[in-house]
Amino acid sequence: MEPRPTAPSSGAPGLAGVGETPSAAALAAARVELPGTAVPSVPEDAAPASRDGGGVRDEGPAAAGDGLGRPLGPTPSQSRFQVDLVSENAGRAAAAAAAAAAAAAAAGAGAGAKQTPADGEASGESEPAKGSEEAKGRFRVNFVDPAASSSAEDSLSDAAGVGVDGPNVSFQNGGDTVLSEGSSLHSGGGGGSGHHQHYYYDTHTNTYYLRTFGHNTMDAVPRIDHYRHTAAQLGEKLLRPSLAELHDELEKEPFEDGFANGEESTPTRDAVVTYTAESKGVVKFGWIKGVLVRCMLNIWGVMLFIRLSWIVGQAGIGLSVLVIMMATVVTTITGLSTSAIATNGFVRGGGAYYLISRSLGPEFGGAIGLIFAFANAVAVAMYVVGFAETVVELLKEHSILMIDEINDIRIIGAITVVILLGISVAGMEWEAKAQIVLLVILLLAIGDFVIGTFIPLESKKPKGFFGYKSEIFNENFGPDFREEETFFSVFAIFFPAATGILAGANISGDLADPQSAIPKGTLLAILITTLVYVGIAVSVGSCVVRDATGNVNDTIVTELTNCTSAACKLNFDFSSCESSPCSYGLMNNFQVMSMVSGFTPLISAGIFSATLSSALASLVSAPKIFQALCKDNIYPAFQMFAKGYGKNNEPLRGYILTFLIALGFILIAELNVIAPIISNFFLASYALINFSVFHASLAKSPGWRPAFKYYNMWISLLGAILCCIVMFVINWWAALLTYVIVLGLYIYVTYKKPDVNWGSSTQALTYLNALQHSIRLSGVEDHVKNFRPQCLVMTGAPNSRPALLHLVHDFTKNVGLMICGHVHMGPRRQAMKEMSIDQAKYQRWLIKNKMKAFYAPVHADDLREGAQYLMQAAGLGRMKPNTLVLGFKKDWLQADMRDVDMYINLFHDAFDIQYGVVVIRLKEGLDISHLQGQEELLSSQEKSPGTKDVVVSVEYSKKSDLDTSKPLSEKPITHKVEEEDGKTATQPLLKKESKGPIVPLNVADQKLLEASTQFQKKQGKNTIDVWWLFDDGGLTLLIPYLLTTKKKWKDCKIRVFIGGKINRIDHDRRAMATLLSKFRIDFSDIMVLGDINTKPKKENIIAFEEIIEPYRLHEDDKEQDIADKMKEDEPWRITDNELELYKTKTYRQIRLNELLKEHSSTANIIVMSLPVARKGAVSSALYMAWLEALSKDLPPILLVRGNHQSVLTFYS
């Protein structure tokens, strides 16, 4: 049966389209192995598998597929997996197969056509291309049907037929062949046994033939592409099926996106990986050319040729070797740490900056990255000036100076740095070739010196060179410090010669395999250069004496009896050097290596090579590091330098900047001051690399798993300490300056808070500390002195009730816990998706607005159930809420009384589990969620720039201040506008943007917006009135005290109001003053209210009765059965008996409101004891009416009731 025709695919070259159906000739002509998934061809009468691969749906003709057994309308999640990775070889093989198929079809070849010559090329039997994923060990799976081994004719005829167990087809996925029982892995060289048909396989729509683990399901097998970053260098990230795709219920109708019908492809299909390199021709270096050569050239600097002999003269052979080994210890430890970080995941460009920033975070990385890039830029000038000085010395010897010494250094240095810039800009390949040439010259110079030590000439003996002599070795083994030099000063001079170990790591982005190259190249370079330094130190110390005159007449003719020096024993008298300075010898001549060498010009070439190679390495490193720093946008002002050019993404702008910096310091030509600072910059980088390894190991993050195992966290810490010590040894003031610069940059980056998340060890250690302290805290018993208000605040979306949020934050900030509870109601599936999104969104909103709080969403059928979940489960260990904070239900008179009953039951639930309760009421209300979408309304009002301001009448159904389930806009409302003089003023306006029309709000919403921000500003000199009527353990008093400790509230005075009797007012005042003094709480006044129990005014009683009238049961006016039925159905109703029983308490609430208006109407805020209603005795309507009567028409009021356990104590 012929498959149905389908629309051609627009896939990438070399990748067969999803909708294409290969012909029989094409299938017979080639065995194309693609390292990805394949879709088997399915006859049209075979039913397609269900989306989850768990069965087969019989959908009849309507479910006919595209000829490949797939439904015509794949869902976006299906199309995501329809194309897999294709190597470059496979692409060429597919093209060859297609050409062969076309030729066979033109010749009239049938299904049994023989293999074409292209078959071998397309079979994938040739060796994979170097660097391809297949060559790197990418897994490949062949699915072979047993029938395929019989003959080509059987194979091809069965491909179109249906057997008992499905079509007998051969299909493959490359590489590891999966065989059915009785099949053979190896096919014969001829006939049909060598033919394997290639098909495309979609795990989402056809899993009938894939009876092997990992392929008979939508689940994806583990593969490297699922773990790539979206900006991966080797290919794009391939998405695995989401948990929702595997777990959610199937849709009744598949989503039709038109892709299978030849329409525009879906975005998910466009994002499928093509797994090619970034672009053709990208230059990548191995460990020798990329790391070893660079590190050796950078470590072997001018110091090797012109200072090492002087160091041996000063410190002697023994201490010189010790100096070298001390420097090697520091660099080796740093090399081990670098290797550990470099093998803990894929390393990109950026060198030391990348390693430190991804380990310690952007703060340290940003600081080090900037100074390290600058240090490399200035190092270019240092090395070029060293080269120029050597050239000027040669010119001076031959008396051919151009102007004078200083200007000649500038001219030669400028010309040199221009040439080096040209080599660098030409590309990394040219730069690498130049480094190889310079390394060869350097090695020849070292060899020239070694050969020269074995062929001493008579003419060189007066200059102190006698060849290898035990007398010279013994004399030079000990130190002879002169001119106030010490061991540490000599060490400070030598140590810069040991730096340069990061030369390879600095171009990590240009390495083929940084994880392997950096450890091998860096550590081997340290070993080789150390051996060379030690060898040359011992050689020169064994061949050359410390002092020599250079005078051939200083030979000794007769043997002296008092001869002690090595020169004297070798028949030379250089004793005159003790009284007058000499020009030769280790102590006096910096050109000892040139003198000793067999061919002096080669040493000069070695000096040129050492300086130019180091300059070239630094000229390449600085822009690469700076580009990586700019790409991360740590310093937004430098963003322009992130741009790369060409196939290698070369930082041309960075090259120009580095060139200008280097040229500036070359023209100064005085680097004696800046040199120690640069050395300290390098050492600071080394110290932080070592500290990064220690810190990452200390944090015990599961993500810290370096492939390089030869490191130790304590040795890394020792290395960091040694680096800091060496910084002070080299130059103490430069070390201090380095610390100041690093600290300043660290503070800047910390303040700016760059929007990056690299999973640093700082984050890991933060978690570990929090975990350890939480566990430790769980073993601490509660004590009254350590009580802290830990509030569960039913905010809903945090930005919907800013006044509630800020007020609670004012007394919990840096003192107690604050959790913003949000109850999601509605269909569970939708609510779960919203919660997943809201969790991250609102936590970010809290952090952005500097709210020290946690966001806790929960799904429930209703508000009460959600609050119960939160009260029982929110928090961790001892960090659990102990106080429930609610907004007052302002709309209770218009709301469904079942919602009111649910609201009141939150109080009872909180008291049941020993929570305190705080109710916050603002007369304007708390909920501004209905205003947060108003910006969208403005777009419809904008007609032209000349449109007049439009008054918006905001119509909405008033929602409860407690409704915690409404979806909200993330953007907060702003009503600040700029006046003509540029000052910012608060206006009752809502703006969309600066250029749009200004839309006034109505009066009610204007007041609501003003009230919502009242706790965000300084409260001024006013009072906090505390009505501590009932002893709840002290929470009613503790909250206002905590408010006064905050900056915004510090000018407010606490006034305390208590109930009492008229004949005991003075006594009660003194008793309360004594108690407050013992609690050490400052207060401005204490007022004793002796008339609390006075009957309230009649009009207020009438107003209260009008409020409760709709909610009364009036059982005396109804038959008993009807009344009982109503009470059962509507338990919130107020009975006559209940109203009479609690008349006194009702009057008290009304009376207290009158007293509050009398005494506290001007207070900033009122904190008052919350009346408690006995559960089962007081109806919800009556209790709600009490709260309404008590708190209406007042300044902001907090109704507080602790759990009646002491939270204050006067004991020490």
Curated annotation (Swiss-Prot):
Changing residue 489 to C: Slighly reduced cation-chloride cotransporter activity. It is a multi-pass membrane protein. Residues 761-778 are annotated as: Scissor helix. Changing residue 499 to C: Strongly reduced cation-chloride cotransporter activity. The keyword GTP-binding does not apply. It is linked to Deafness, autosomal dominant, 78: A form of non-syndromic deafness characterized by congenital, profound bilateral sensorineural hearing loss affecting all frequencies. Some patients may have mild motor delay early in life due to vestibular dysfunction. Sensorineural hearing loss results from damage to the neural receptors of the inner ear, the nerve pathways to the brain, or the area of the brain that receives sound information. Delpire-McNeill syndrome: An autosomal dominant neurodevelopmental disorder characterized by global developmental delay, hypotonia with delayed or absent walking, bilateral sensorineural deafness, poor or absent speech, and mild to severe intellectual disability. Additional variable features may include spasticity or minor involvement of other organ systems, such as hip dislocation or ventricular septal defect. The lineage of its organism: Eukaryota, Metazoa, Chordata, Craniata, Vertebrata. The RFXV motifs mediate binding with OXSR1/OSR1 and STK39/SPAK. Activated following phosphorylation by OXSR1/OSR1 and STK39/SPAK downstream of WNK kinases (WNK1, WNK2, WNK3 or WNK4). Inhibited by bumetanide. Inhibited by furosemide. Changing residue 289 to N: Impairs transporter activity. Impairs transporter activity and reduced sensitivity to NKCC inhibitor bumetanide. Changing residue 1031 to A: Impairs transporter activity. Expressed in many tissues. Changing residue 500 to C: Strongly reduced cation-chloride cotransporter activity. One of its GO terms (biological process) is intracellular chloride ion homeostasis. Residues 36-81, 112-138, 150-193, 962-989 are annotated as: Disordered. Changing residue 501 to C: Strongly reduced cation-chloride cotransporter activity. This is Solute carrier family 12 member 2. A motif (RFXV motif 1) lies at residues 80-83. It comes from Homo sapiens (Human). Cation-chloride cotransporter which mediates the electroneutral transport of chloride, potassium and/or sodium ions across the membrane. Plays a vital role in the regulation of ionic balance and cell volume. The modification Phosphothreonine is found at residues 203, 207, 212, 217, 230, 266. K(+) binds at residues 298-299, 383, 496-497, 499. Residues 150-160 have a biased composition (Low complexity). Gene3D superfamilies: Amino acid/polyamine transporter I.
